[in-house]
């Protein structure tokens, strides 16, 4: 979607239509050097796995820096393994390199460089769906400034406060170490770095919102604000906080993990009365609207409800308080401070918001005579089933909207069907006294089903895996086989435009249907207990090195070595840049 004043050339349009996850051909003659280094790292991983085999993953200390320099003596490994590595190194020294085919034209490659260097436009992925959105840089900044000028949420500051925040966090970490809650190594890992990276704000355009409701109708869409916390003074501390908050959030009665978890929970309401109303609620700007004073009180209640002697409640709340109050960031050369709620981008933000909403829900329900007989929430999206009539429901929602001053809801009520997450929940027989609740895949209007272009520079098995996983997802989300076939047809039409052949797609679906019929589909039956430890050889994908890696892994698997017993060696490819 081009919202900018820049007129895209044919080549620019062609390269953008491939999607932002498209990888141009990685064409270098030095891939053997990189592969040799990756093999050495994998060799070291095998040595470390052997050296620490008696300790197990359960005893591994969390929140510590790994020692990247020390390597155990090679003699602890079976000689046949070391010999295999030596032969592979020697083979790579004499390996004949070759160039890969080009998956974009010369004009498209030039267009890509031109788009990268164009400072007048910003290219982003849409907030929902897979659309590529091009905006004028000035329009993009206008939307961010519109949000920043809300004094309730943000405050302009003359200088960064993260150096002061780092000092406060370091003092709390020292108390944690003295109290025995963290080790000296963990304290080193969690301590803010001497030169932390300033946080930066960016937005993802919400083009799924009605264009007439945009800040500048049909021109500047609202943006979802995200503050990048990576390498900041509190980044590792956020990991530590999330270690305690996330398990608590997952234990709450209203919690939904994902769409599949939602379907499992919905099975408890298999049949509902015909007068049942289906409702979805959306919390408006939940992250930024949390009152942090109230949020910390909510966390204290959760901690008291779920006591854990290994959890440093008081000091943990101190860490959270300092992290929330010190959330400054840089935008366009100016520092700003978020003074309300938390920001998407902070690791513990989803768990914090979840627990805050849990307490709000619990307290509100205690004040009501009538409540939903089914109530579940995924972050800021709520699904309810209601049997007490529309007037009572409207009173319930109005009271919910006024219960917590900072939290407001947008509702959708329907007697037959509603869309929630990526599913549509509907009544099978709306006029029957008791009706079955069914589900099918929901496609948002802006979802272009841009998965991965078939010509992207990825391993071949990646494309089949993506298609099969989507077919499997559609199958699980569809109550009726007719809906499943209908949604896969929509998917296949979109994939054909991304240069997937019809034969390739049909073969994958036919194989999937055979697995369904025979009961051999993975995921359709309980998973067996797997004890094998996965050891990945991580490397950068290149056609020239792929055969070498495959051959080496195959030979390792065939070795009858006790050092490889109970392990499963796989190849993992890092993203090309």
Predicted regions and their residues:
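Charged structural interfaces that engage phosphate-rich ligands
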Residues: 1-577
């Amino acid at each position: 979607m081009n919202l900018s004043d820049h007129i895209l050339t044919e080549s620019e349009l062609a390269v953008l239509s491939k999607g932002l996850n498209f990888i141009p051909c990685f064409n270098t003659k030095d891939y053997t050097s990189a592969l040799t280094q990756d093999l050495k790292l994998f060799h070291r991983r095998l040595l470390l796995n052997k050296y620490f085999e008696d300790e197990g993953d359960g005893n591994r200390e969390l929140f510590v820096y790994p020692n990247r320099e020390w390597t155990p003596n090679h003699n602890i490994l079976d000689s046949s393994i070391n010999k295999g590595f030596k032969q592979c190194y020697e083979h790579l020294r004499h390996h004949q390199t070759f160039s890969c085919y080009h998956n974009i034209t010369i004009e498209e490659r030039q267009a890509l460089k031109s788009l990268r260097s164009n400072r007048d436009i910003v290219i982003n992925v849409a907030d929902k769906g897979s659309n590529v959105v091009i905006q004028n840089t000035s329009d993009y900044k206008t939307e961010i400034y519109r949000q920043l000028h809300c004094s309730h949420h943000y405050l302009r500051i003359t200088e960064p406060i993260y150096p002061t925040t780092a000092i406060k966090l370091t003092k709390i970490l020292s108390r944690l170490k003295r109290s025995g809650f963290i080790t000296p190594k963990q304290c080193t890992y969690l301590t803010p770095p001497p030169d932390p990276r300033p946080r930066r704000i960016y937005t993802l355009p919400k083009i799924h919102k009605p264009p007439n409701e945009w800040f500048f109708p049909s021109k500047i869409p609202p943006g979802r604000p995200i503050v990048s916390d990576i390498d900041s003074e509190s980044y590792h501390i956020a990991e530590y906080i999330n270690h305690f908050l996330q398990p608590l959030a997952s234990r709450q009665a209203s919690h939904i993990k994902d769409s599949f978890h939602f379907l499992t929970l919905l099975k408890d309401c298999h049949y509902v009365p015909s007068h049942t109303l289906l409702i979805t609620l959306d919390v408006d700007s939940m992250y930024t609207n949390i009152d942090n004073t109230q949020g910390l009180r909510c966390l204290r209640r959760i901690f008291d409800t779920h006591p854990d002697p290994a959890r440093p409640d008081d000091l943990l709340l101190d860490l959270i308080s300092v992290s929330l109050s010190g959330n400054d960031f840089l935008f366009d050369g100016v520092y700003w401070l978020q003074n309300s709620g938390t920001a998407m981008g902070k690791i513990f933000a989803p768990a914090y918001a979840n627990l805050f909403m849990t307490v709000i829900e619990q307290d509100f329900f205690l004040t009501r005579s009538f409540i939903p007989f089914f109530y579940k929430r995924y972050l800021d999206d709520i699904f309810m089933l209601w049997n007490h009539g529309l007037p009572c429901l409207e009173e319930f929602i109005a009271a919910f909207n006024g219960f917590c001053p900072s939290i407001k809801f947008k509702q959708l009520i329907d007697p037959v069907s509603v869309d929630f997450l990526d599913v549509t929940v509907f009544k099978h027989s709306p006029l029957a006294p008791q009706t079955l609740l069914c589900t099918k895949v929901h496609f948002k209007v802006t979802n272009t089903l841009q998965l991965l272009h078939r010509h992207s520079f990825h391993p071949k098995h990646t494309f089949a895996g993506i298609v099969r996983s989507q077919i499997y997802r559609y199958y699980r989300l569809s109550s009726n086989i007719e809906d499943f076939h209908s949604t896969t047809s929509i998917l296949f039409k979109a994939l054909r435009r991304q240069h997937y052949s019809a034969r390739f797609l049909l073969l994958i679906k036919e194989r999937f249907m055979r697995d369904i019929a025979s009961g051999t589909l993975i995921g359709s039956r309980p998973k067996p207990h797997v004890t094998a430890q996965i050891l990945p050889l991580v490397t950068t994908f290149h056609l020239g090195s792929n055969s070498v890696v495959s051959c080496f892994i195959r030979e390792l698997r065939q070795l009858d070595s006790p050092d490889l017993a109970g392990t499963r060696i796989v190849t993992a490819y890092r993203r090309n840049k």
